[in-house]
């Protein structure tokens, strides 16, 4: 009984986790110009 439940809960959890991580990754990929400026300033100050 428990194995049956885990059999369909685990894939859903894994897919959900992947979607969440992909979503946050995509969001962090598209930085605002202000964020990009801060990062470039930081990189220039700390080579």
Curated annotation (Swiss-Prot):
Its main location: membrane. It comes from the Bacteria. Keywords: Membrane, Plasmid, Transmembrane, Transmembrane helix. GO terms for cellular component: membrane. It is a single-pass membrane protein. The chain crosses the membrane at residues 5-25. It is found in: Membrane. NCBIfam families: CapE_47_fam. This is Uncharacterized protein pXO2-54/BXB0062/GBAA_pXO2_0062. It comes from Bacillus anthracis.
């Amino acid at each position: 009984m428990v194995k049956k439940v885990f059999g369909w809960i685990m894939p859903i959890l894994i897919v959900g986790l992947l979607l969440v991580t992909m979503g946050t990754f995509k969001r962090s990929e598209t930085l605002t110009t202000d964020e990009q400026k801060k990062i470039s300033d930081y990189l220039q100050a700390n080579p």
